[in-house]
Design a protein with these regions (language model features):
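Internal, well-ordered alpha/beta segment that forms a basic, Gly-enriched binding/recognition surface
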Residues: 81-121, 128-129
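Eukaryotic endomembrane system proteins
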Residues: 108, 115-116, 122-148, 157-161
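C-terminal flanking tails of non-heme Fe-dependent oxygenases
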Residues: 1-95, 100, 143-144, 148-347
Length: 347
């Protein structure tokens, strides 16, 4: 299968076809193969997540952003050496530029871990979340969403691997109970005062799969083969799925991670989105995938400014240190002053 001419619209993939007859599953695999190899993005329907589950999360999210500013700032990401909590507008960076959005970062609820001097510093990324006392329903809805979408993503990954002739359970052992999922609740509060328009700058995700729930405002753009960024019109009830850099590494570039960005909505219009990142254990090493098309893989897209590593935690910590300079300065300045302590920044 070769990369082909494209439509500006993303492919639509119905995951429920996996549970129908063998012919329907074969068609699903053909669609997944093409979408992951040619585009790196697609719209996912038939995923089984109900409207009630979605409403529970989005209602709690809107209630969170409607809290008094002081209540949100009490959960400031800068309080957390684990990079959990609330990030104010402009405090996160992509490629060094300010992102015009605020957000709440949530992960698996675990005890704080302080790595010993001989341990990898990425273990700082394990720890508790910060929750607003006034909204207990947010904790319930967010942790349910993480569990629910982890199941959807696992199923999708199985079908995706099968679609390229690989063993569908090839990566099961790097996920499991110590997987490192990540959820963001994001608000884009209209255009910035300086007219920059960067909701979030162009980037690729560094995990395995991202499942994005977006509202109907729009603003997500994907870079296609022509080098231009194309709008992704919202599709009610669908998740926008994109492949992360680890799948590109695992397949030596046969499956592609694609640049994408968000353009700030115009004027005072607000945009809300919920990206879920399906990530393996922090200490997982991503072995090359064995599959029939491996000989045709073009190789991984090289970016000297953003080296990729087979050990997942090194990639995530590298990204967090760059994206959250204030939290990094407070809790992890030693990793910048002594980069040899953090292999991801020096290898």
């Amino acid at each position: 299968m070769t990369r082909s001419s494209y439509s500006s619209q993303l492919p639509i993939v119905d995951l429920s076809a996996a549970d129908r007859d063998p012919q329907a599953r074969r068609l699903l695999h053909a669609q997944l193969h093409s979408a992951a190899h040619d585009v790196g993005f697609f719209q996912l329907i038939g995923h089984g997540v109900t409207e009630a589950e979605t409403r529970a999360l989005t209602s709690a999210m809107h209630a969170f952003f409607a809290l008094p500013e002081a209540d949100r700032i009490a959960l400031d990401n800068i309080n957390s050496p684990h990079f959990r909590g609330y990030t104010r507008i402009g405090d996160e960076r992509t490629a060094g530029a300010r992102d015009w959005r605020d957000q709440l970062d949530i992960g698996a609820e675990r005890a704080a871990r302080t790595p010993a001097p001989w341990e990898a510093p990425y273990w700082w990324l394990e720890g508790p979340n910060q929750w607003p006392e006034a909204l207990p329903e947010l904790r319930t809805a967010a942790l349910h969403w993480i569990e629910r979408l982890s199941g959807v993503a696992e199923r999708l990954l199985h079908e995706l691997l099968a679609s390229i002739g690989a063993p569908e359970d090839f990566y099961d052992d790097i996920f499991g109970p110590r997987a490192h999922p990540h959820l963001k609740l994001v608000r884009y509060p209209g255009s910035s005062g300086d007219g920059d328009g960067q909701g979030v700058g162009a980037h690729k995700d560094y995990g395995f799969l991202t499942l994005l729930l977006q509202d109907q405002v729009g603003g997500l753009q994907v870079q296609r083969e022509d080098g231009n960024f194309h709008d992704v019109p919202p599709l009610p009830g669908a998740f926008v799925v994109n492949l992360g850099e680890l799948l590109e590494v695992a397949t030596n570039g046969y499956l592609i991670a694609t640049n994408h960005r968000v353009v700030s909505p115009p004027g005072a219009t607000e945009r809300y989105s919920v990206p879920f990142f399906y990530n393996p254990r922090l200490d997982a090493r991503i072995n090359p995938l064995t599959f029939p098309y491996a000989e045709t893989a073009p190789g991984v897209t090289a970016d000297p400014a953003n080296p990729l590593f087979a050990e997942y935690g090194r990639n995530e910590l590298k990204g967090k240190l760059r994206a959250h300079p204030l939290t990094t300065a407070r809790h992890h300045a030693d990793l910048l002053l002594h980069p040899e302590a953090q292999p991801a920044l020096s290898s």
